[in-house]
Amino acid sequence: MGKSDRLQQGSKGKGGGKRKHGKCVLMFDDKDRQDFLTGFHKRKLERRRAALEEMKSKLKEEQKRLREERHKEYLKMLQERRQALDEADELEEAITATTECVQYDHPNHTVTVTTISDLDLSADRLLEPAQRDGGDGEERERTEALPKQAGNPLLSKKIQSLTASLNSLVKQKKRRKQKRRQEAKQRSHQSDRKSSSSAFVHNNKQKQGKSTKRQRRRQTGRNERSQD
């Protein structure tokens, strides 16, 4: 009896030991769900924007580098120009103000002959010194002006492509016009030939029209003689 009672008590204890789990309800936020589903497109647009910004920055850097290189070349040319002008001024001064001294020794006295040559190069250039100086100042002001900014290479490529397409269209139109003119000339020549041939045939028919009585009599006389 004791064993059976224990088995019954164990079975009751196991059956009553099961616990019921509570229900789990999942709630989705529509906004977060939409953001998750459209995230691929957003990331694609962001990558595209980043690529465009990177291209713009590279283009700006390239333009800046080209401007700096042009500015350096311009300064170098300006320096060379100034050196050439200075050398020309020195040469002009050396030519326009030269002195030669020659001494002749005699037993009683000494003779010194000094030759001073003062050439005016402005006469050869047909310019006065003041005007020439003013022109040099204007040239220097012009050379000291800053260089123009380089154009946009992308826009220049687009303009080149547009001009090429326009030129091709113009050439095609010219070719079509030439073909039409040639066809019109050929048609006019053919029509002239036809009209000339028809006129020639008509004239022959007119010439071969009805014969006169005199011609018929002569023809009948010839026939009678041939029969005899």
Curated annotation (Swiss-Prot):
Localization: Nucleus, Nucleolus
Basic residues bias: start-end ranges: 171-180, 204-220
Top-level taxon in the UniProt lineage: Eukaryota
Compositionally biased region (Basic and acidic residues): 126-145, 181-195
Molecular-function GO term, any one: rRNA binding
Pfam assignment, any one: Nop25
Region annotated Disordered, chain positions: 1-22, 126-228
Chain coiled-coil ranges: 40-103
Polar residues bias: start-end ranges: 158-170
Record keywords, A-Z: Coiled coil, Nucleus, RNA-binding, rRNA-binding
Family recorded in the similarity comment: Belongs to the RRP17 family.
Function of the molecule: May bind to rRNA.
Protein name: Nucleolar protein 12
